[in-house]
């Protein structure tokens, strides 16, 4: 019998992905349905509903659930849920759909799911603004200052404001996991697959390290703290879409493979990937990270400095603080059971000659080097020398190769532009 934490919501893994004859029959039916083109984010959400990663959700939220999640961080039935999971459509599409109708949800020519539309509701500019304030603003600037910069500088806010005029809600039948199983074999895992792997190892107390950047020395330090205090650590990478300028998942996965192979005891670490896009929701997104990690069988989330941060919008430890403020339903099945493992500031200390934290290092600021993915990307993109304490040599070599390839592509484009060639 598994010793792992139960899935969120008290209903086991709620998986909307069809298989076998049911899948073939639904695909045939989908061919005759009205098609709705969906975003990359919605595609990731659908796959998570398909594989049970978003348990207990079985479809996109209606307006009552959307409002309750924004205001209270719970669904209307009292189950904890930190961010809206909605599907937007244009006014013309909304007008063409009737409640009770089934539609096919399509992403770039691939039918991802069918959906029974139970509700169609308008999202006014005031509704979108409310979602941004409650979900994305955090505890930082006041509303006036937030709105001075967020529409241009906050990627999560920009996405919400750019959404179409209506949302549609209802249960889904998922027909595909997209490109992820083939693109990331052995890394992309469903909750059931990861749970089986951890059960084989007899794990019970498991920590996850959330990653959207290449794994630098601070990440390695956090992961090894998790190894020390838990049965094992899952290095869990986002393999969906990020913002322009971020490093592709294929490169990040290769970096982690190399790091795990050379610097970890393999019995105590698993590399895995999940199919979501970043929402850039700051502290609320940290809660989402914990929520779906519970579905993967993980009961601790490593939360360090500026977890899921966006620029300067959030306090350095606001993502840790929100776990103390979230609602705790009386029913344990509806409560979030994945707890944070809070880690203080981490850095490379020149005097300690190694990674340290505010709790372990007595030295001053002049001896401390804060490591971040943003700094690392900047140095690599500019071709600057990267100090050894930022990353392992083997990882930096992979990243340099990637950025070298980008430089070559830019130079080729410039040469073609100068010569007038479009080939």
UniProtKB/Swiss-Prot annotation:
What UniProt keywords apply to this chain's record, in alphabetical order?
ATP-binding, Nucleotide-binding, Nucleotidyltransferase, Transferase
Lineage, top-rank taxon, reads: Bacteria
Pathway the protein acts in = Sulfur metabolism; hydrogen sulfide biosynthesis; sulfite from sulfate: step 1/3
* One Pfam family, short name: ATP-sulfurylase
**EC numbers, comma separated:** 2.7.7.4
Q: Which reaction does it catalyse?
A: sulfate + ATP + H(+) = adenosine 5'-phosphosulfate + diphosphate
Q: Biological process (GO) annotations?
A: hydrogen sulfide biosynthetic process; sulfate assimilation
Which residues are in coiled coils?
none
- A GO term for molecular function: ATP binding
Q: Which NCBIfam families match?
A: PRK04149.1 (NF003166), sopT (TIGR00339)
Q: Which family does it belong to?
A: Belongs to the sulfate adenylyltransferase family.
Q: What is this protein called?
A: Sulfate adenylyltransferase
Q: Which organism is it from?
A: Desulfovibrio desulfuricans (strain ATCC 27774 / DSM 6949 / MB)
Organism taxonomic ancestry: Bacteria, Pseudomonadati, Thermodesulfobacteriota, Desulfovibrionia, Desulfovibrionales
